[in-house]
């Protein structure tokens, strides 16, 4: 479920800080010739630390109830980071084609003329049917084949099946609470709630 914010709920506050952390468990093994062997110990995931200003009662109630409801029903907490909302790419992504069998750290999008504009390096990217959020590391347009190739970090969490479409806007991080504990109610003498924070980690479905 979507984390309440000013875009979706008039009573919801915006956060004052959003610390996005790259967690990429890698094992490094130095070889006799001096080279370093890198082995992925587990899948990469993003974690997110959200901090909020002092909250009025209704603001606190909206946020805490949403968190408790997500825990109750076993749902993810979906977070939009407004600094990545740029709409550099528009058009009709449903008319593009992502062929089946793609894996690794890049993706090729066919029928690219259905899209207008181009993403910047560092923009977020998703594909339909996948929960993982990626960052764009490179962009190559091939006019002859009417395709674009995006370099992605991290690598694709699962192999494409040919039904996916690209997502460049309104990208949601599908997160869960790190310890499934709701934030503490810290009410001061002025009736304001202090120190509301959320520590979340990405919930990646790689099946």
Regions found by a protein language model. Name each.
Residues 1-207:
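Extracellular/virion structural assembly segments
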């Amino acid at each position: 479920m979507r984390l309440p914010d000013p875009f979706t709920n008039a009573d919801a506050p915006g956060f004052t800080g959003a610390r996005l952390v790259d967690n990429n468990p890698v094992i490094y093994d130095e070889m006799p010739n001096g080279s370093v062997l890198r082995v992925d110990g587990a899948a990469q995931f993003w974690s997110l630390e959200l901090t909020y200003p002092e909250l009025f009662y209704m603001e606190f109630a909206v946020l805490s109830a949403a968190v408790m409801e997500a825990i109750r029903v076993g749902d993810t907490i979906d977070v939009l980071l407004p600094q990545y909302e740029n709409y550099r790419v528009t058009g009709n992504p449903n008319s593009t084609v992502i062929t089946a069998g793609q894996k690794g750290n890049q993706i090729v999008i066919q029928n690219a003329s259905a899209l207008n504009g181009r993403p910047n390096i560092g923009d977020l990217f998703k594909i339909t049917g996948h929960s993982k959020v990626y960052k764009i590391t490179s962009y190559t347009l091939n006019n002859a084949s009417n395709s674009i190739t995006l370099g992605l970090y991290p690598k694709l969490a699962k192999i494409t099946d040919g039904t996916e479409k690209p997502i460049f806007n309104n990208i949601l991080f599908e997160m869960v609470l790190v310890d499934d504990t709701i934030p503490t109610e810290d009410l001061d003498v002025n009736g304001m709630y202090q120190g509301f924070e959320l520590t979340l980690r990405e919930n990646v479905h790689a099946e």
